[in-house]
Amino acid sequence: MSSNAPRHTALDALHRSLGATMTDFAGWDMPLRYGSERDEHLAVRSKAGLFDLSHMGEITVTGPGAAALLNYALVGNIASVGVGRARYTMICRADGGILDDLIVYRLQEQTYLVVANASNAQVVLDALTERAGGFDAVVRDDRDAYALIAVQGPESPGILKSLTDADLDGLKYYAGLPGTVAGVPALIARTGYTGEDGFELFVDPADAEKLWQALTEAGAPAGLVPCGLSCRDTLRLEAGMPLYGHELSTSLTPFDAGLGRVVKFEKEGDFVGREALTEAAALAEKNPPRVLVGLIAEGRRVPRAGYPVVVGGEVIGEVTSGAPSPTLGRPIAMAYVDAAHAAPGTAGVGVDIRGSHEPYEVVALPFYRRQK
């Protein structure tokens, strides 16, 4: 296979049989939408949606020194994560630049599952492997060992309960437990990227189609629909969740992104980027260069990544993500803007959309927060 040929998930034929529009995403052929991305988005907000996320990058870290390695390699306090729990964290360069944002699951006392973004999986694998020197731990590429299926939305707990004996009521947000779903062995994690309650199911690729079909049948009465990456992007945008390559990059630190809370300076020992991030934290507190904010359009024109944010003809920031919001019924965006213009309600802010000044309201993120 040539290096340019896209990879296919275990559900590729099934997506095509459902009439999915496919797209190349991070070297994978993935479903963009099955019909209307707006309908898929609203189904997740009100009922439930089913996603194939098998392009994500799973990396297993095992051994007596696994916790110490991850505490050194990542910015979070991974050693403090209990067995069966998960943590959102980041891996940074020595200069503090973000290599990726991650979720780390502690499966056993000496076993962790690191889940990287598809576009950065190899970068994260290489960094962890390089940083493992001197630690009694093994870093293993498990990208081919898992298919990942997510069911997201307010109806997702009921749908999943009908297919498993696992204690879903006792499964907290950012927790995971082994179980079986429709007879399929799975890691059942209460995580997601939509702003809704939901579950991510890590299974053997050979079982993926069986599990997808079982979830489809069990979810039909509740209004579950298959969902593509297009609505996943608008869902995470409404929820104010960052996307690597847009809100996060190697040119930004976690503090630049307003996510300094993931950096745990109080943990024992050194970690990659500690010195640079200490400086970044001090700068962010005294004089932040730019701040990540939400923007809501007063009109109908949609901003895209890279469009300038302006006040009185002066560029004061840049859009990182933008789309029509199915929930709000108006275009929305995330943008980095100068701190002086970052307060909600700041007057005169607009986006330069192909030479036209379009007025936008500055708001605090997220745009949408589910009722719990």
Curated annotation (Swiss-Prot):
Q: What class of enzyme is it?
A: transferase
| EC number per UniProt | 2.1.2.10
What keywords sit in the KW lines? Aminotransferase, Transferase
A GO cellular component term found in this entry reads: glycine cleavage complex
| Residue spans crossing the bilayer | none
Q: Which SUPFAM superfamilies does the record match to this protein?
A: Aminomethyltransferase beta-barrel domain, Folate-binding domain
Q: Which GO terms describe its biological process?
A: glycine decarboxylation via glycine cleavage system
Which InterPro entries does UniProt cross-reference here? GCS_T, GCS_T_bac, GCST_C, GCV_T_N, GcvT/YgfZ/DmdA, GcvT/YgfZ_C, TrmE/GcvT_dom1
Q: Name one GO molecular function term.
A: transaminase activity
The reaction(s) catalysed by this protein are: N(6)-[(R)-S(8)-aminomethyldihydrolipoyl]-L-lysyl-[protein] + (6S)-5,6,7,8-tetrahydrofolate = N(6)-[(R)-dihydrolipoyl]-L-lysyl-[protein] + (6R)-5,10-methylene-5,6,7,8-tetrahydrofolate + NH4(+)
Record-linked Gene3D superfamilies: Aminomethyltransferase beta-barrel domains, Aminomethyltransferase fragment, Probable tRNA modification gtpase trme, domain 1
- Entry's HAMAP family? GcvT (MF_00259)
**Subunit annotation:** The glycine cleavage system is composed of four proteins: P, T, L and H.
Which family would the database say this protein is a member of? Belongs to the GcvT family.
Record's function text: The glycine cleavage system catalyzes the degradation of glycine.
Question: What name does this protein carry?
Answer: Aminomethyltransferase
Q: What is the scientific name of the source organism?
A: Streptomyces avermitilis (strain ATCC 31267 / DSM 46492 / JCM 5070 / NBRC 14893 / NCIMB 12804 / NRRL 8165 / MA-4680)
